Curated annotation (Swiss-Prot):
Cellular compartment(s): Cytoplasm
Protein's job: Catalyzes a reversible aldol reaction between acetaldehyde and D-glyceraldehyde 3-phosphate to generate 2-deoxy-D-ribose 5-phosphate.
Keyword check for Cytoplasm: yes
Family: Belongs to the DeoC/FbaB aldolase family. DeoC type 1 subfamily.
Matching NCBIfam families: deoC (TIGR00126)
Superkingdom field: Bacteria
Top-tier EC class: lyase
Record-linked SMART domains: DeoC
Gene: deoC
GO BP annotations, alphabetical order: 2-deoxyribose 1-phosphate catabolic process; carbohydrate catabolic process; deoxyribonucleotide catabolic process
E.C. no: 4.1.2.4
Protein's organism: Yersinia pseudotuberculosis serotype O:1b (strain IP 31758)
Listed name of the protein: Deoxyribose-phosphate aldolase
A cellular component term, taken from the record's GO annotations: cytoplasm
Length: 223
């Protein structure tokens, strides 16, 4: 059976120097190729929502991005503001420093605060797996399952590494068959996308969506 790669793709542009014209182009590409969503910084949600109005492509906003180290109240507020501006999905970054400090209750409360402000809007929780041990990945995945979030997500694409097959497999094994798993960071071609899907990913975050659906090799840089 042929994989419908477009349905997996969150077409992504999160660079700090991304221009409005580039966001508009991102949205046009997403409509043309029928991607699942575009993923942008919260400040560009109104532009993306306007460009995608009337289409099937959803608007996803990152929150607390890329460090995840801000105040919990700020993350919760940003999530609600992004939803009010037109975001239909939210991707938040956990506080990795708190996790590594053993502040597990604070990490869970941080996720819960954003989840509570998302209401019915799907929440994806970014683990930044390149910075975590397998035990920590399992710990956060179990936490997210308990909090009934929609997805766990591998990476911001702004740290020391992106999605790895073994991490996606571990995340899938931990959360079970129903919860979403998003592989993001360094997924730049169809072969890598297929590897992630076979490992258990149900969404792919990438700036190389056009290359993936066309079967081409994308640039070595990019999300």
């Amino acid at each position: 059976m042929t994989t419908n790669y477009a349905h997996y793709i969150d077409h992504t542009l999160l660079a700090m120097d991304a221009t409005e014209a580039q966001i508009i182009k991102l949205c046009e590409e997403a409509k043309q190729h029928h991607f699942y969503a575009v993923c942008v910084n919260s400040g560009y949600v109104p532009v993306a929502a306007q460009q995608l109005a009337g289409s099937s492509v959803k608007v996803c906003s990152v929150i607390g991005f890329p460090l995840g180290a801000g105040l919990t109240a700020a993350k919760a507020f940003e999530a609600q503001a992004a939803i009010n501006a037109g975001a239909q999905e939210i991707d938040m970054v956990i506080n990795v420093g708190w996790l590594k400090s053993g502040k597990i209750a604070d990490v869970k409360a941080d996720i819960k605060a954003v989840r509570d402000n998302c209401a019915a809007t799907p929440l994806k929780v970014i683990l930044e797996t390149c910075l975590l041990s397998d035990e920590q990945i399992v710990q956060v995945c179990k936490m997210c399952r308990e909090l009934d979030v929609a997805f766990v997500k591998t990476s911001t694409g702004f740290s020391t590494g992106g999605a790895k097959e073994e991490h996606v497999k571990l995340m899938r094994a931990t959360v079970g068959p129903v919860m979403g798993v998003k592989a993001s960071g360094a997924v730049r071609d169809r072969a890598t996308a297929e590897t992630m899907i076979q490992a258990g990913a149900t969404r792919i975050g990438t700036s190389s969506g056009v290359a993936i659906v066309s079967g081409q090799q994308a640039a070595a840089s990019g999300y």
